[in-house]
Amino acid sequence: WMMIVEQKCRVIVMLAKCFEAGKKKCQKYWPDSEETKTFGRVKVFNADEVKYCGFLRRRFHIESFDENDVCGRVFQYQYINWPDHSVPNTTSNLVRMHKYVIQCLEEIGGDAPMVV
């Protein structure tokens, strides 16, 4: 989260699930919906989670304990239809998620960096 604050990222795109076929694939680095968790000097509140066909969109509010840091809303898009050792059956959900990401970037400022 420190990288998100330092680089002023407003959108995170994630292409992995946390678990696949019973194996851990990615560390869950966010709190559950409507919960707050502190990560070092950054407090993260998961304001909501919306499930779309093939992906999730989470909206976080972040605060830093350093008053010089700029914080606020951060959106996370997590594609959940990519199989572990293969490719998706169709690209339509991934393309749809991409359109949502672009729309989000336009709404919050087109120069917003993205962590992929």
Swiss-Prot record:
Binding site for substrate: D84
Key word Hydrolase present: yes
Keyword annotations from UniProtKB, A to Z: Hydrolase, Protein phosphatase
Signal sequence segment: none
Gene3D superfamilies per UniProt: Protein tyrosine phosphatase superfamily (3.90.190.10)
Catalytic activity: O-phospho-L-tyrosyl-[protein] + H2O = L-tyrosyl-[protein] + phosphate
GO MF assignments: protein tyrosine phosphatase activity
EC number: 3.1.3.48
Domain Tyrosine-protein phosphatase residues, every copy: 1-116
Origin: domain of life: Eukaryota
Entry-linked CDD domains: PTPc
Keyword presence, Cytoplasm: no
Family classification: Belongs to the protein-tyrosine phosphatase family.
Protein's recorded name: Tyrosine-protein phosphatase 20
Source lineage: Eukaryota, Metazoa, Chordata, Tunicata, Ascidiacea
